[in-house]
Amino acid sequence: MTARPLSELVEPGWARALQPVAEQVARMGQFLRAEIAAGRRYLPAGPNVLRAFTYPFDEVKVLIVGQDPYPTPGHAVGLSFSVAPDVSPLPRSLANIFQEYTADLGHPPPSCGDLTPWAQRGVLLLNRVLTVRPSNPASHRGKGWEPVTECAIRALTARQQPLVAILWGRDASTLKPILAQGNCVAIESPHPSPLSASRGFFGSRPFSRANKLLAEMGADEIDWRLP
């Protein structure tokens, strides 16, 4: 992650939204460069660390919260739960998300694990922690990303525009007090991880429920279809 002003790294609306934590973002850039200098790598690749914030801030209608990036090299792409088009087999959590997507919406299974179309249509795919050390899950938790992503979520709620937050798992559910401050409705269920998907994630119908809630708030629905 290069040492550049926030306005050169993210979409203009996000640059304004994240201005209160601009110095913290810069500190995290220093942290990542120090990791590289010490011979330690991080995921996703530098240009993708802030990728979730490169899509228009004002167009976000749905928030899907992840914990931290996939630690498997080649998987993390800067959007929560998404992977590059050539990744096979899919991470188990993403495979379970697609199983629920098909059951909920009746669409055929997607051809790959790339969730970029969702990001382009107003779905913020945001991890609470934006980087991880390869093969070392949760290794960058508590290093300083949490204030950045919480600022992002507070900025979304402050817009007073319709927002549906899809919260999978206990970690994501801790965001409810922040989300309650705006025109936001939360959909909660267990995490799609193989450890918990059968305890209420399957059958939770998050995609159709999100669209129903958006319609009730007077907003356009999300086109969830993936190629």
UniProtKB/Swiss-Prot annotation:
Its EC number(s): 3.2.2.27
SMART domains recorded: UDG, UreE_C
Cellular compartments annotated: Cytoplasm
Active site: 68 (proton acceptor)
GO MF, one example: uracil DNA N-glycosylase activity
InterPro entries: UDG_fam1 (IPR002043), Ura-DNA_Glyclase_AS (IPR018085), Uracil-DNA_glycosylase-like (IPR005122), Uracil-DNA_glycosylase-like_sf (IPR036895)
GO CC annotation: cytoplasm
Family membership: Belongs to the uracil-DNA glycosylase (UDG) superfamily. UNG family.
Functional note: Excises uracil residues from the DNA which can arise as a result of misincorporation of dUMP residues by DNA polymerase or due to deamination of cytosine.
Annotated protein name in UniProt: Uracil-DNA glycosylase
Annotated source species: Mycobacterium avium (strain 104)
Name of the gene this protein is made from: ung
